[in-house]
Each structure stands twice: as structure tokens, then as C-alpha cells.
Amino acid sequence: MKPIISPSILSADFAYLAKDIEMINRSEADWVHIDIMDGVFVPNISFGFPVLKYVAKLTSKPLDVHLMIVNPEKFIPEVKALGAHIMNVHYEACPHLHRVVQQIREAGMQPAVTINPATPITLLQDIIRDVYMVLVMSVNPGFG
């Protein structure tokens, strides 16, 4: 299995965002990782959908959108419309994870699931075959 490189733009300087995206476009990176935080599921707020739309216009790489938000299923159509290829939701934010994964796939994106550092990976045994990838956080979500 080939490792996938998906640099995050979480710590990018907005004044140089276009330049940073161009650098990623010229790199060997496979995807661009965009973290969207709502200040509810996680304590911080990050990019919103306008930034996702802007980055989608600039990049030649697939967009890996990581939603650290409550009720991510409400935003599936918007995330797809804004150009995401992979929609990554948190196990802890989705009481009906199977349904959310199915909705992401039906929208035409690759479903991915993230777990927090303290969440046992064994909790994913019933969903693992239904997702494109699993992201295991090495820090508590909301901090980069």
C-alpha cells in the first residue's frame, strides 16, 4: 500500500494562502487536507466553507475535508458542491455513523472516519470495510 501525503493548511497564513496552495500543487503531495472546526465539537474555530471554496479553485489536488463539527451529515451536499473528494467525519460526532458514511458515498465522495486519541480503534470494526480511510488523531481534535 502506497502512503498518502495530504498536507494540512490549518497553520497556513491567509495572506499567503494562494502561494501555499501553489507550493502544494507543485509538490509530490497526493491531496490537500482542510480542517473545518465549529467551536462546538472542538474548542476552536478554523476555516469555514468560503475558504474551502477558495482552495478548491486554486488546487489541482483532491481535497480531503476533515469536519470537526457536530452534525456533519447536514453539510454533505455543501461539502460536495464546494469540491471535496474525501469527506472525513468523527466517530464521536456521528451517532448514526453507518448512515453518514452511506450518505457521503451517495453524494459522490469517499467517506473517511476519524477517531480521537482516547477512542479505542476496535469501535470501528463494524464500519472499517465501508470507509475509504481512517484517520487516528495523535492530538485531541481542535489543535494543530
Q: Could you say what each language-model-derived stretch is?
A:
Residues 1-88, 93-96, 103-106, 110-111, ...:
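Conserved N-terminal beta1-alpha1 strand-loop-helix module at the mouth
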